[in-house]
Amino acid sequence: ETLAKINSEETGKPIRESSIVELGGVIRTFDYYAGAATKILGNTQVINENLLSLTLKEPVGVVGQILPWNFPLLLASWKIAPALAAGCTMVIKPSELTPLGTLEIAKLCEEAGVPNGVINICPGVGEVAGAAIVQNPYINKISFTGSTKVGKQILKASSDTLKKVSLELGGKAPNILFEDCDIDSCL
């Protein structure tokens, strides 16, 4: 309830949307990745009777996560839960417009037993806090959701260190309208 209230106050969304869409999604995301954590296994492939090929999945290390403002709780969970399941620590920069929900999620994770220092929140503006995360040599991967412009900047800035980078950029919502479509009803 506190988390939904914080989200509504930060985003201006109705409490019902914060509760059902965002908080419901957060709960489902953490539940899913809690189960997934037990299924991250390496593989063994028999090449021939004298040769095996083994893979071992290991955490990537420290993940820098930069979040947008539009779905702050849900998108925070989409970054935090998989990183926890994979055994990674993280430095998270929430949007400067909606930092409180992410801070509250981190607090709840700590109360649930996640050790201190696993989830680290770095509030601030992107040009300062985000840039510090991207340029930090001890951060092994960057996960960013936001604009294409900033995504390009992150990709360039991280190329010197060859960090792994995941970008979710500038969502699109295309529509296909056929000749017989009533355009007025589509608007």
Residue ranges with predicted function:
Residues 7, 30, 87, 119, ...:
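Residue-level signal for inorganic ion chemistry
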Residues 52-53, 120-143:
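A structured beta-alpha segment of the ubiquitous adenosine-cofactor-binding alpha/beta core
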Residues 30, 102-105, 133, 154, ...:
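Hydrophobic packing residues within well-ordered alpha-helices of enzyme cores
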Residues 80-81, 130, 151, 187:
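Generic hydrophobic/aromatic pocket-lining and core-packing "Φ" positions
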Residues 1-51:
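N-terminal Rossmann-like NAD(P)+-binding subdomain of aldehyde/semialdehyde dehydrogenases
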